[in-house]
């Protein structure tokens, strides 16, 4: 089973460019190479596709023991995972692209993600964390053709989702995610591949569509005191 899982990881690395040891050796981005224009304000709208998942026994037990009344970190104004952040409806994401960085400002929880752009072949790229949100790990980014790729490791234990029928899908410290952001017209597709051998027998792929928006980014202003008022009891 482990040999099969490793084979899946190798195939995944080749397909999407995960910077695992001895995996993708993508060429550095030429400074003159055109980058996709992802800038602007976006709001969730359109397709959400959770690919099939196959829990390990530990993953199944973790999923079945989830209790939203005490396990959802949103009641403490904390994002559970990047997929959970992207899933939130009716709030904006503003993307700002610069020569050496890309900034994603999420209205939900006022998350400000300032990512360094790196060489995808670097064995030890610069990564950033989000203060007070350890479940969001350490991230770095690069461009790959028409996509912005965001690679994240070192997650704290948490949940891929705390929403709808996916609530309680777990993530462990071994979780490794790759987000690929692509734009087609006024549609932004965020495809996230989750690799977590502790809880899943094969990679979990989630795809979420966003639409261009004329609304402006606003302060979310969550405080633990306010969140506690609406928290279930």
Segments from the language model and where they lie:
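Positively charged n-region of N-terminal signal peptides that target proteins for export
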Residues: 1-5
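Bacterial N-terminal signal peptides
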Residues: 7-19
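PEST-like low-complexity, intrinsically disordered acidic/proline/serine-rich tracts
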Residues: 24-233
């Amino acid at each position: 089973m482990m040999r099969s899982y490793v084979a899946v990881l190798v195939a995944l690395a080749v397909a999407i460019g995960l910077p695992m040891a001895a995996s993708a050796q993508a060429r550095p981005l030429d400074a003159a190479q055109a980058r996709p224009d992802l800038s602007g304000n976006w709001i969730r709208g359109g397709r959400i596709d959770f690919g099939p998942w196959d829990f390990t026994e530990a993953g199944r037990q973790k999923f079945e023991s989830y209790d939203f009344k005490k396990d959802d970190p949103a009641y403490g104004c904390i994002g559970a995972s990047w997929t959970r952040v992207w899933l939130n409806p009716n709030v904006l994401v503003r993307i700002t692209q610069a020569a050496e960085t890309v900034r994603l400002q999420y209205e939900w929880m006022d998350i400000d993600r300032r990512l360094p752009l790196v060489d995808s072949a670097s064995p030890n790229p610069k990564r950033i964390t989000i203060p007070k949100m350890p479940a969001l790990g350490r991230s770095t980014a690069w461009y790959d053709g028409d996509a912005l790729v965001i690679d994240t490791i070192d997650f704290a234990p948490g949940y891929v989702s705390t929403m709808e029928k996916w609530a309680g899908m777990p993530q462990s410290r071994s979780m490794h995610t790759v987000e690929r952001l692509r734009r087609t017209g006024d549609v932004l597709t965020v495809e996230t591949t989750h690799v977590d051998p502790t809880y899943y027998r094969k990679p979990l792929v989630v795809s979420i569509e966003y639409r261009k928006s004329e609304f402006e980014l606003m302060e979310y202003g969550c405080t633990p005191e306010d969140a506690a008022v609406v928290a279930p009891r």
